[in-house]
Amino acid sequence: MSQHPSRPALIALLLAACLLVSGNALATDLDDEIPSQRPEVQSFIDEMVQKHGFDRATLNQQFAQVRMKQKIVDAITRPAESKPWFEYRPIFVTQTRIKEGVKFWNAHEAELQRAEAEYGVPPEIIVAILGVETRYGRHHGGWRVMDALSTLAFAYPKRAAFFRGELEQYLLLTREEGLDPLAVMGSYAGAMGKAQFISSSYRNFAVDFDGDGKRDLWDNTADAIGSVANYFKRHNWQPGAPVGSPAMVGSNRISRLLKEGIKPHTPVKELRKQGVTALQPLPPEAPAALIAFEKKVGRPDYWLGLNNFYVITRYNHSPLYAMAVYQLGEAIKEQRRD
């Protein structure tokens, strides 16, 4: 038998090699590329000048110092939320993070109580958000926000429109707040500060909670606490209402109910008629959504998520994120009570 590959096999091998080389070249080319060389960046600069009155020379100078990074594109294609629940939960709901949350709550009890009084959002939710996002303000991200947003706006077609909008919001934000756009650090997605607000959220929902005249989510814990609470209030958090409940499912309609999504759609009492029973008391008229959380072995854990669960997903659209926040907050509250 001949040991030489067939002609089709050779063609396939050559194509694979070309793809590999071109992929590596793309990664190499993108790293440290100066985006101002791209025509779409010049179009963006034109828009910022015409629409918002920015100085063209200043923007050209700033974009000449921006460096695009392949690692940013790589990171956004591998978010933690792509993991199954049984791998995701142990990242965030840990004894260390619970203890740190108790300590944070005790240190900032006055601000948390004031935030609850003003916005209706309980301390455990605010604390858990800050715990999941930045380990209570310790890890803000190691990327220049200008690099991150420019990379995603001009080299990540899947979400280019969104990040182009966030880059616009970022330049407006830094102008309004008197910040150097090339000096601000954040996440690979351009989220900033203790609360990891993206630029549009910072402009719309950040508050000066301590009254010092600045909205500072990097160094001012009071502002971070107040801003998270304001974000939840503005997204229709219902004070005193439950977040959700574990559920017992004895229905052959599970697939259909799960396909309805995470936005509450059916009253609890109607779901009960369809074989889905909350294991904790819930208002019978409250709309709910059935959500499954994958276990390593066996059937998933089923939960009914109510309005406040959905509100948590407005901070991060993943139900895994919302459940991690809820469970971390409950664990912190329980341990603090003991």
Residue ranges and their predicted role:
Residues 145-154, 192-207, 228:
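Substrate-binding/active-site groove segments that recognize
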